[in-house]
Curated annotation (Swiss-Prot):
Protein origin, superkingdom: Bacteria
Name this polypeptide is given: 4-hydroxybenzoate octaprenyltransferase
GO cellular component annotations of the record: plasma membrane
EC number per UniProt: 2.5.1.39
Catalytic activity of the protein: all-trans-octaprenyl diphosphate + 4-hydroxybenzoate = 4-hydroxy-3-(all-trans-octaprenyl)benzoate + diphosphate
Xref: Gene3D superfamilies: UbiA prenyltransferase
Protein's membrane topology: Multi-pass membrane protein
Protein's gene: ubiA
EC top class, as a word: transferase
KW Cell inner membrane (keyword) present: yes
GO molecular function, one term: 4-hydroxybenzoate polyprenyltransferase activity
Amino acid sequence: MEWSLSQNKLLAFHRLMRTDKPIGALLLLWPTLWALWVASPGVPPLWILAVFVAGVWLMRAAGCVVNDYADRKFDGHVKRTARRPLPSGDVTEKEARTLFIVLVLLSFLLVLTLNTMTILLSVAALALAWVYPFMKRYTHLPQVVLGAAFGWSIPMAFSAVSESLPLSCWLMFLANILWAVAYDTQYAMVDRDDDVKIGIKSTAILFGENDRLIIGILQVAVLALMGAVGWLNGLGWEYYWSLFVAAGLFGWQQKLIFNRDRDNCFKAFMNNNYVGLVLFLGLAMSYL
């Protein structure tokens, strides 16, 4: 019986950390890999690559824990989130806090193997991960903070590899913020009606009927900024083909969200994984 209870608890932790739903980790991973490949340039040192890949999964898990902790009073009122581990009682608040601390400590131990500049930048990463879940109470732009949190691995990657933060770093960082606002607005469109009822703020609510147009503008800006990164670093035709393919994927997302159907908005959000992958493949092939 004890094993059964322990197994149930582990499964609850598994759901709390979203390890059963890797899309968030992948959306965090791709920009990290972009930055590592551009900063190196080419294949980065294997230890640095391993640290960042492990750090992505650990900090994404920590972010999910603190997000659910912040939303524990709201999630029970939203159909999609009512069965999450905290509102359902499968995980206690104390257990969630402890799990968050463990995940952050493991991440920090990895960062300690890198240079001082990267260690200092990691403090800002933790602050962004902690602050983001609470922003949806106070501003309609929590997605901007999410973009900064998901993109902070970019300056950290440049720092770890080259101990510098060139213009390419900040253009890529800005592109990631705009990309995150676009895809998380698609995600927020799924819950928009419920969020309005319970007082949660989001860009989907702020943009209203202009949501599709603004998402489109953001997507064009992402492509322009990533094109500038390619130009500054002398990347080859492989990279620009990847931008062309990414533009096609963005066009498909616009088709999916056209009628604002919840299921299709979620499919559009999920499709962004392929955008990140395609851009990484273009970068990687340019450095072969």
